[in-house]
Swiss-Prot record:
Protein name: S-adenosylmethionine synthase
Family: Belongs to the AdoMet synthase family.
Residues that coordinate or bind ATP: 16, 175-177, 251-252, 260, 266-267, 283, 287
Binding site for L-methionine: 57, 100, 260, 291
Biological processes per GO annotation: one-carbon metabolic process; S-adenosylmethionine biosynthetic process
Localization per record: Cytoplasm
Subunit organization: Homotetramer; dimer of dimers.
Superkingdom: Bacteria
Length: 416
């Protein structure tokens, strides 16, 4: 008998309060690394009605006007009208930053760190910026090697923002959330059970003032302008049995920071795999690459994606453990959920042979310090909304599958 079940993942738009904070944190990171690529950054942001607070620890030679950066990013997201309860021009921006603790810095700093290319021995001398566990995951459910539920939730969220920004649905406001429940049979997606969209909107639409009629129009417009285009190129589509919910509370006029306070790092499941894979608990945004919460999670995704792309497994999850001030991981674990074409121990040996998981090595391999300046002072802020993984719209080093051929060849040689 086949096993049938549902799995649900959610996403949020760039105007969600927590995502505003993530994007501001990473905009600050981009600006600092663009001027000083060895900046140490742990930028935390809080937003509330009419207020932005920047706090955390930063050690950098860069000269950055934080208030201007914040206002520009808020305007880019779409909060330019005080009627939304939050505006780039009128919000108060407070800055309360400290320098990184020297007790932490001494564990991750080495004399060789400022060199562009480090030897193997030198990489061993630069430790992790903190203890922690990180996970990476990939599967072959989608072309981008991501689970289908989070892939669809992100697609809908991005499309929702796009039709707002282009003016196609000009009554939409920046805040929004999406959620998709996918039907699985024997571990493979076969259909769509539920699509949920909650979107902030104007109280009236043209001459329509009755809220029930407003909601009817929003629901109809979103189906035509958002949902149908998202599924147009996919084999799995909504059908007559799919539940389609829009603003199920009845309306969503008050939103953004006026509706809820936001905080950096509160959407870690949205940022990763939508709950389909485990999470080590550390957030990404606002952290420079010495923080393994971020850089090592990117590396683990790279490892898992190449393993699946090489055909060694249909699903692969990697866990790596780190100790502060220690370069080499204290643990490495592989799980293929019974889908591996070879034993997990064989895959583990291939990872140890072909992948770099020391923090300084990860930074060097992916050029994580240099990318912001190379890409016009914006790199990390572009992954701060709509997911850090599976982003075929961005050229991300950890999304490359350049090791897949090497893994295939190594495995073939070992078998022969």
């Amino acid at each position: 008998m086949s096993k049938r079940y549902l799995f649900t993942s959610e996403s949020v738009t760039e105007g969600h309060p927590d995502k505003i904070c993530d994007q501001i944190s990473d905009t600050i990171l981009d600006a600092l690394l663009s001027q000083d690529d060895h900046s140490r950054v742990a930028a935390e942001v809080v937003v509330n009605t009419g207020l932005v607070l920047i706090t955390g620890e930063i050690t950098s030679k860069a000269q950055v006007h934080f208030v201007d950066l914040v206002r520009k990013k808020i305007a880019e997201i779409g909060y330019i009208n005080a009627d939304n309860g939050f505006s780039s021009n009128s919000c108060t921006v407070l800055v309360a930053l400290d320098e990184q603790s020297p007790d932490i810095s001494q564990g991750v700093t080495a004399a060789q760190e400022n060199r562009e290319l480090l030897s193997n021995d030198e990489l061993d001398k630069i430790g992790a910026g903190d203890q922690g566990i990180v996970f990476g995951f990939a599967c072959n459910e989608t072309p981008e090697f991501m689970p289908l539920p989070i892939s669809l939730a992100h697609r809908i969220a991005r499309r929702l923002a796009a039709v707002r920004k282009t003016g196609e649905l000009s009554y939409l406001r920046p805040d929004g959330k999406t959620q998709v429940s996918v039907i699985y049979e024997d571990g493979r997606p076969v259909g769509i059970d539920t699509i949920l969209v909650s979107t902030q909107h104007d109280a009236t639409i043209g001459d329509i003032t009755d809220n029930d009629l407003v909601q009817q129009k929003i629901k109809s417009d979103l189906w035509e302008a958002v949902v149908q285009p998202v599924f147009s190129d996919l084999e799995i589509k909504p059908d007559a049995n799919t539940r389609y919910l829009v603003n199920p509370t009845g309306k969503f006029v008050i939103g953004g920071p006026q509706g809820d306070a936001g905080l950096t790092g509160r959407k870690i499941i949205v940022d990763t795999y939508g709950g389909y894979s485990r999470h080590g608990g550390g957030a990404f945004s606002g952290k420079d690459p010495t923080k393994v919460d971020r850089s090592a999670a990117y590396a683990c995704r790279y490892v898992a994606k190449n393993i699946v792309a090489a055909g060694l497994a249909d699903k692969c999850e990697i866990q790596v453990g780190y100790a502060i001030g220690v370069a080499r991981p204290v643990s490495l674990f592989v799980e293929t959920f019974g889908t591996g074409k070879v034993a997990d121990d064989v895959i583990l040996d291939l990872i140890n042979k072909y992948f770099e998981l020391r923090p300084a090595g990860i930074i060097q391999t992916f050029n994580l310090r240099g990318l912001p300046s190379e890409r016009g002072e914006r790199f990390y802020q572009d992954v701060a909304a709509y997911g850090h993984f599976g982003r075929n719209d961005l050229d991300l080093p950890w999304e490359q599958t350049d090791k897949a051929a090497i893994l295939k060849e190594a495995l073939t040689s070992a078998v022969v």
